[in-house]
Amino acid sequence: MQLTGASMFLVWVGLLSWVSCRVDASEGFPSPLKRCKLQDESCLLAQAQTFFQAFKNGIPERQVAALEPIALGTMFIESGGHSESIKFKLTMSDAKLYNLANSMMVKSLKGFTKDLTRPLKLTLLLDNPELEVRAKYDVDGKLLILPIVSKGDLTIRLNDVHTKVWITAEPVKRSDGHTYLNITDYKTATKIKGGHFDLSNLFNDNKELRDSTLKVLNQEWSTLALDVQPKINEACAKAFSAIVQSLWANIPYDEFFEKE
């Protein structure tokens, strides 16, 4: 399940945010972060982890949005015929992703180079033990022969999310003499152990009908995820593409690492 297109952007955002407050090497990085040597992956991983905790509220002066929560906007989802027993049209509005900054574990980060004559290719391994998407929902569908037409609050809990990320970024030299990066491509491969849906106001909160319906929905998690996952992943990618591009517009890559 490719939910965490978001995750791949966040780590790269975090790493580049080390210099977001002070680009000049003589001024140092905003506490508690520090510049790393190019090949020191353990330092890069440590600083990426620190970033999530230190800047979960974003960096307003750089127009970097908050990491807790992450605004995903509105998603329109329609069942794709994966199950005859469940058919629906679902709108998720004011959607937000929670617990990414609090639970992110960066397991590997490779591909940094000083060669600015060709595209940078990064590979990342990311783990999140638990993520949560919350939104307002509006659904029109059916479960078996039971119609489901409802509005309310939706929560999707995602457990043990493991993501591999590939990012390609093009170095661009500007008139100021510095080189900046522009993302040209990204790919993800994500596995998730399981998930859980919770919807308020089903059948006007008739407890018996609500509980039995949610039980069936959660038993069909894998089927539902085939339709819900791509839309969430698309929303995450859009949100973090904007974050990365706005940040990279002000941060020269050629001043990123500690001098050797």
Swiss-Prot record:
One of its GO terms (cellular component) is extracellular space. This is Circadian clock-controlled protein daywake. Belongs to the TO family. Named 'daywake' based upon its function in daytime sleep suppression. The lineage of its organism: Eukaryota, Metazoa, Ecdysozoa, Arthropoda, Hexapoda. Residues 1-25 form the signal peptide. Disruption phenotype: RNAi-mediated knockdown in per-expressing cells increases daytime sleep levels whereas night-time sleep levels are relatively unaffected. Keywords: Biological rhythms, Signal. InterPro entries: Haemolymph_juvenile_hormone-bd, To_sf. The keyword Manganese does not apply. The keyword Thylakoid does not apply. Component of the circadian clock or downstream effector of clock function. Required for suppressing daytime sleep (siesta) under ambient environmental temperatures. Part of a heat avoidance mechanism that modulates daytime sleep behavior under different environmental temperatures to minimize the risk of heat exposure. Under cooler ambient temperatures, suppresses daytime sleep (siesta) and thus allows for longer periods of daytime activity. Gene3D superfamilies: Haemolymph juvenile hormone binding protein. It comes from the Eukaryota. GO terms for biological process: circadian rhythm; positive regulation of circadian sleep/wake cycle, wakefulness. Epidermis of newly eclosed adults. Induction: Expression is under the control of a thermosensitive enhancer element called dmpi8 that is encoded in an intron of the close-by circadian clock gene per. At lower temperatures, splicing efficiency of dmpi8 is increased resulting in an increase in the expression of dyw.
